[in-house]
């Protein structure tokens, strides 16, 4: 009767709500640790460090128009005017909104995370010399310094992450670290390492950092610490 049908439905619903465990299996056995055990695989991880830099920083008009628009950093070849002239010169004709900064913020920490992964796994690939290994790690450390430099200079205290996130370290209530601490513990050490190990490069080297780029950025970062009340690094800026 209807009573039996109702009882069966209640029993089925109760059984459906019963908790169960799920044992996951990765048939491909793909992990970043495994990827990093070959040189090609590790350099794929290095390439990922550049993604947010191209997508949200210097390969996109949004971030540069907010931070560098209406300055003398932008012009056009032979002063040729285009539809973007007023955009870059006066930020006119744009429709700025919070999407600009939201995308940039997420991209920044995507880049930081990629750099942290590459740095942490730097001992895995079978490079023949430590010079080769450190040159690649130096790319990731240079980029991490650039990400944090921009984050600190635009937003002040931000969350400082220097290790890959794991299930144990994941938090939904991150804390902020003051700018000077980030300079001392991340930006300056990363740029010193990059200055030591990045290759000199040639005039054709335009898409990857070189020793000259690292030295220039190190000097800039050292000078910027003066804004936070420190004179400790001014001589290092002159020597870089």
Regions found by a protein language model. Give the residues of each.
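Bacterial N-terminal signal peptides
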Residues: 7-16
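Membrane-proximal, proline-rich intrinsically disordered regions
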Residues: 19-67, 238
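Short, well-structured active-site flanking segments
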Residues: 23-25, 152-164, 234-235
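Short coil/turn linking the two alpha-helices of tandem helical-hairpin repeats
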Residues: 152-153, 159, 202, 224-230
């Amino acid at each position: 009767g209807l009573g039996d049908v109702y009882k069966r439905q209640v029993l089925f619903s109760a059984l459906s709500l019963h908790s169960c465990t799920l044992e996951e299996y990765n048939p491909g056995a793909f992990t970043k640790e495994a990827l990093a055990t070959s040189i090609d695989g590790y350099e794929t991880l290095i390439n990922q460090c550049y993604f947010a830099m191209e997508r949200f920083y210097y390969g996109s008009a949004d971030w540069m128009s907010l931070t560098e628009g209406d300055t003398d950093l932008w012009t056009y070849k032979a002063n040729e005017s285009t539809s973007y002239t007023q955009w870059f010169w006066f930020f006119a004709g744009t429709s700025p909104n919070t999407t600009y900064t939201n995308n940039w913020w997420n991209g920044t920490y995507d880049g930081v995370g990629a750099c942290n992964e590459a740095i942490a796994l730097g001992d895995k690939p079978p490079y023949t010399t430590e010079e080769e290994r450190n040159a690649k790690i130096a790319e990731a450390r240079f980029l991490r310094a650039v990400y944090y430099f921009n984050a600190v200079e635009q937003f002040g205290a931000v969350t400082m992450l220097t290790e890959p996130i794991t299930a144990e370290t994941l938090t939904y209530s991150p804390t902020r670290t003051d700018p000077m601490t980030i300079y001392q513990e991340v930006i300056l050490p990363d740029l010193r390492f990059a200055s030591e190990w990045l290759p000199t490069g040639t005039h054709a080297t335009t898409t990857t950092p070189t020793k000259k780029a690292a030295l220039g950025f190190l000097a800039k970062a050292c000078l910027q610490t003066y804004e936070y009340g420190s004179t400790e690094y001014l001589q290092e800026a002159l020597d870089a």
